[in-house]
Structure formats: structure tokens, C-alpha cells
A protein has these predicted regions:
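Conserved class I S-adenosyl-L-methionine
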Residues: 169-176
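Short acidic-glycine loop/turn motifs at beta-strand connectors
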Residues: 124-126
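Short, glycine/acidic-rich beta->alpha junctions
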Residues: 113, 153, 176
Length: 176
């Protein structure tokens, strides 16, 4: 990639690369075509909510969320899976993480008054990717523009389209 990281996998709407904390920061700042940057905590297979609970509970959440961390399942999506209720998936995943952190931190209750750790769950054909969202708002809303107008496409899509052309930074680009 342009940032110097090796791409591990390319799937529909998702590019996976390995990196450290600095790589996450750099990706959030410099990637022009990404909507968000996430840290994959795990991939789990589940066709029942009990299987989902146990699989999520088995992940190493203590490596990502500190004892005072504020965490919630910001979004759950499901396509062609037996588990089809996003709200139920959100509830089960949150409960499983709480149970895991109770065991790891020897706590019965969490204040959740520290840094925020939004979680996203993507189910496809009974396999879920569980990830921490490091971007917050979509990256096309990075906030460097004070006054914006409605555009027919997002900045990230526009950047991708330009990258497919022979244009380079030494040439003038006009956005009519």
C-alpha cells in the first residue's frame, strides 16, 4: 500500500492489513479511500445466540479494553445468516464481553467512565467479524472543511475514482 503495510486479505468492502498502534493512527489520517479503520478482535462462527455468546466470550477482550473502558456494540450487521436480529446480536455480544472482563479483571461491575471502545459486528453466512472501531465518524467526515455542501458522492469515493485515472499531483484537477 501507499502507507507501506502489506495487505493480508481483500474482501467485499474490506481490506485487511497487519500493523501496530502507529499503523492504526496513520491509516485513520492518511487513507483516502477508507470509510473507517478497525482492529479485528476475532472471527467467530455462530448459528445460535449461545454459540455467539461463547465465541465472543472466548476472545481476548482484556488486550483491548481496560477495566474503566466504556464499550458498546455500535453496529451489528447480518447477511445470509441464521442470526438475523442486529439488536439481539448487539445485546449478546455486549453481555459476553462483560462476562469475559468480569473474569479477567475480577470485578462484578464496571463504571465504564474511561476511554470509548465502540465495537462493530459483521455477520455473513454465519461467520462474524468482531472489531473495534478506531475511526469514530466515517473518514469522509474528517472535519478539515468548515463549510461543506451536498455532494453527489463522498470524498472517499471521489478519491478512489481519481486513483483509477492517470491523473497525478503535477496536473491540474478541476471539480466543476
Amino acid at each position: 500500500t501507499d502507507l507501506g503495510y502489506d495487505i493480508v486479505q481483500v474482501e467485499d468492502g474490506r481490506v485487511t492489513f497487519e500493523g501496530d498502534a502507529l499503523a492504526v493512527c496513520r491509516a485513520n489520517v492518511f487513507l483516502r479511500t477508507a470509510e473507517r479503520v478497525m482492529i479485528q478482535v476475532g472471527r467467530v462462527k455462530a448459528t445460535t445466540y449461545d454459540q455467539l455468546f461463547e465465541a465472543v466470550k472466548a476472545l481476548d477482550w482484556q488486550k483491548f479494553i481496560p477495566v474503566d473502558g466504556k464499550f458498546w456494540v455500535k453496529k451489528a450487521g447480518t447477511v445470509k445468516s441464521k442470526l438475523f436480529s442486529p439488536s439481539d446480536i448487539q445485546r449478546i455480544v455486549k453481555k459476553a464481553i462483560v462476562e469475559k472482563l468480569k473474569m479477567e479483571y475480577h470485578e462484578s461491575w464496571f463504571a465504564e467512565d474511561g476511554a470509548e471502545y465502540p465495537i462493530r459486528v459483521f455477520f455473513y453466512k454465519d461467520e462474524a467479524i468482531i472489531a473495534l472501531d478506531t475511526s469514530g465518524e466515517s473518514l469522509h467526515k474528517r472535519g478539515y472543511r468548515k463549510n461543506t455542501s451536498k455532494a453527489p458522492i463522498s470524498e472517499t469515493l471521489a478519491a478512489a475514482l481519481i486513483m483509477l485515472t492517470p491523473w497525478n499531483k503535477d496536473r491540474i484537477l478541476v471539480d466543476p
